[in-house]
Amino acid sequence: MSPRAIAASIAAVAWLACALAFAAPPIPQSLAAQEWTAIRKVIDDQREALKAGDGAKAMTYAAPGIREQFGTPDNFMRMVREGYGALLTARRTQFLEGAVIEDAVVQPLRLVLADDTVLVALYQMQKQPNGQWRIAGCLIAPSTVQST
């Protein structure tokens, strides 16, 4: 990513961290490789459930606050279709390097759409008391990187 793209991503992550108020245990400033693998699996599994139209399963990958906010699988799927359609329709995806910024764990996912538009989905992750990672929020931002 270019320095400008990194700065834009950091600004978006800062906005996301401020916008999402949740109680979570402190996170170390770096995570082990197996933690990033677990995080990416949660994101992949939720996207598969979303693409299959399985709102109930997709909600299981969301943090408790997100599940409470949307209440039902139908409401959750409606929100995804209306605001996060790129997650469902991207023709290609690529995980970028994740980051821990203060207590926010952020996993970027590059999305390439059918028209070669490139977006970045910034997932904020939350580790649950049982040790599992859940999605606490997602912000989709334009990318300055072109499709290859």
Q: Which residue stretches match the model-derived regions?
A:
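Exposed beta-sheet edge and beta->alpha loop/turn motif
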Residues: E97-T148
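Bacterial N-terminal signal peptides that target proteins for export
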Residues: M1-V13
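Acidic, low-complexity intrinsically disordered segments
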Residues: P26-P28, A33, G83, E97, ...
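N-terminal signal peptide c-region/cleavage motif recognized by signal peptidases
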Residues: L16-A19, A23-A24
